[in-house]
Amino acid sequence: MSNLLLIIDSVSQKIRDRRKLEEFGQNPDEEIESSLKDVRQELQKLNEEQSRLEKNAQIPEYRVRESEAFLIRMQRRLESAEEEFEKQRRASSIPADGTSAFSANPQVASTNNKLTPLPSLQKTTSSSEGSDIEMEAMYPVDGNDPDPINVNVLAQMHQQMLNEQEESLGGIEASVQRQKRMGYAMNTELSEQNVLLDNMNNDADRIERRFDHAKNRLNKVSRKAKQYPRCFIILLLCALLLLVASI
């Protein structure tokens, strides 16, 4: 289906650019006719595939209707392209006297016959005319849209987008889990550091109390020495004698 869409888009663009190519001295008619022939062959294959789908009871009805709607849509686009091609050829083949070259040139007339749709495609279109209204109600076509998107293609694109979003969400979830584990590890480390700081504060308080106690003793000794200077000198000399004697 995608190949057929590409071919129709390509031949439609060639038809639109036909006049510009003729101005540069090129003749794209043979290439356009070949492309139109390829489109008819692809439509013939789709017509045969549609017949097989309709005969297969295991195929869901919506699948058959989607395929039929796509086939009708492509047939209409082919007819529109052929009509535009014929209009341009008629316009470019009318000489100054107003007579048409198609009536005088049998080769051009035979080429005209090549552009008629295949009988099998005419049969498919006529057999599906009764369900055109239903098909258009189920799959409305925007007249301004040159390339309507098939429902299956749209569903596949939507599913692919959902899968990509799911993968992205999975990556985000894994990243959040890693950050969560890192947060737990940092919390544990901070708790250990808090315990260590508490122990250091306790040790500092204990040392400070010892210094205060020693300071109080020194102050007490200093007051005693001021009250009894002679006794203090005697005690100091005795301490020195004991120290010398021990050496």
UniProtKB/Swiss-Prot annotation:
<dbReference type="GO" id="GO:0005802">
    <property type="term" value="C:trans-Golgi network"/>
</dbReference>
<feature type="compositionally biased region" description="Polar residues">
    <location>
        <begin position="100"/>
        <end position="130"/>
    </location>
</feature>
<dbReference type="GO" id="GO:0000139">
    <property type="term" value="C:Golgi membrane"/>
</dbReference>
<keyword id="KW-0175">Coiled coil</keyword>
<comment type="function">
    <text>Involved in vesicle-mediated protein transport between the Golgi and the vacuole.</text>
</comment>
<dbReference type="InterPro" id="IPR045242">
    <property type="entry name" value="Syntaxin"/>
</dbReference>
<dbReference type="Pfam" id="PF05739">
    <property type="entry name" value="SNARE"/>
</dbReference>
<keyword id="KW-0472">Membrane</keyword>
<dbReference type="GO" id="GO:0097576">
    <property type="term" value="P:vacuole fusion"/>
</dbReference>
<dbReference type="GO" id="GO:0005770">
    <property type="term" value="C:late endosome"/>
</dbReference>
<dbReference type="GO" id="GO:0012505">
    <property type="term" value="C:endomembrane system"/>
</dbReference>
<dbReference type="GO" id="GO:0034058">
    <property type="term" value="P:endosomal vesicle fusion"/>
</dbReference>
<dbReference type="GO" id="GO:0048278">
    <property type="term" value="P:vesicle docking"/>
</dbReference>
<dbReference type="InterPro" id="IPR000727">
    <property type="entry name" value="T_SNARE_dom"/>
</dbReference>
<dbReference type="GO" id="GO:0006906">
    <property type="term" value="P:vesicle fusion"/>
</dbReference>
<feature type="coiled-coil region">
    <location>
        <begin position="27"/>
        <end position="94"/>
    </location>
</feature>
<dbReference type="GO" id="GO:0005484">
    <property type="term" value="F:SNAP receptor activity"/>
</dbReference>
<protein>
    <recommendedName>
        <fullName>Syntaxin-like protein fsv1</fullName>
    </recommendedName>
</protein>
<dbReference type="GO" id="GO:0031902">
    <property type="term" value="C:late endosome membrane"/>
</dbReference>
<dbReference type="GO" id="GO:0006886">
    <property type="term" value="P:intracellular protein transport"/>
</dbReference>
<feature type="region of interest" description="Disordered">
    <location>
        <begin position="88"/>
        <end position="130"/>
    </location>
</feature>
<dbReference type="GO" id="GO:0006896">
    <property type="term" value="P:Golgi to vacuole transport"/>
</dbReference>
<keyword id="KW-0333">Golgi apparatus</keyword>
<keyword id="KW-0653">Protein transport</keyword>
<feature type="domain" description="t-SNARE coiled-coil homology">
    <location>
        <begin position="159"/>
        <end position="221"/>
    </location>
</feature>
<keyword id="KW-0813">Transport</keyword>
<dbReference type="GO" id="GO:0000149">
    <property type="term" value="F:SNARE binding"/>
</dbReference>
<dbReference type="GO" id="GO:0000138">
    <property type="term" value="C:Golgi trans cisterna"/>
</dbReference>
<dbReference type="GO" id="GO:0031201">
    <property type="term" value="C:SNARE complex"/>
</dbReference>
